[in-house]
Amino acid sequence: MRIYLVRHGETIWNTEGRIQGWKNSNLTEKGIEDAKALGKYLRDVDFQCAFTSPFQRAIDTTKFILGDKNIVITSNDNFRELNFGTWEGRVFQDVKAEYPEQHYNLWNKPEAYIPVDGEYLEQFRERVRQGINDVIDSKYDGNILLVTHALVVKSIYSIARNLPVDKIWDTPRIGNTSLTIL
């Protein structure tokens, strides 16, 4: 099994510096073009199936990557981004000003992060781990496309490397439409 792990394309909120989480923001033209370009790059890969987060930005990215390929796309709730609770839709700098300790903890001491009506990182990682187990336990054993979100990719990477949650930010930067192959 080979998993082609992709972060969704650039969104409007990405360009505005807003926290997305479970709230959606549409792809920008750049996000669409980047997804199509990645699809062109991967055109010779014979995907058995595609898994995606249920959020529209990930679904759209998946469709643009696959183009006219007739591939089964399965949405899996376990591949949703971290639920940032009341921070969602807000600009990072505003959240930092209003919740300085929790903002600091999220980025510097993730094990101490206490979400405001959102999801703890340990809960999130267990959800992502279950999603990966769903893929591994699926009937597919060839090339699999998985389109999801930055923190999900970081979590999968850290899980694969047996890193604790406090090392989640020590993983590589995950840009929009980036590709990681497992």
What spans do the regions from the language model cover?
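Phosphate-coordination/substrate-recognition cap region in phosphate-metabolizing enzymes
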Residues: 39-103
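Active-site-adjacent alpha-helix immediately C-terminal to a catalytic or transition-state-stabilizing loop
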Residues: 59, 130-181
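Glycine-rich, phosphate-binding/catalytic loops in enzymes
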Residues: 21-23, 66-69, 91-92, 161-165
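Loop-to-helix element that buttresses phosphate recognition and phosphoryl-transfer chemistry
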Residues: 4, 10-61, 115-129
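Short, basic/glycine-rich phosphate-binding loops at helix/coil junctions
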Residues: 15-18, 101-115
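Short amphipathic alpha-helical segments
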Residues: 17-18, 62-64, 157-160
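Short coil/turn segments at beta-strand junctions that form active-site/ligand-binding loops
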Residues: 1, 46-48, 140-144
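Short coil-to-beta-strand
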Residues: 1-10, 101-104
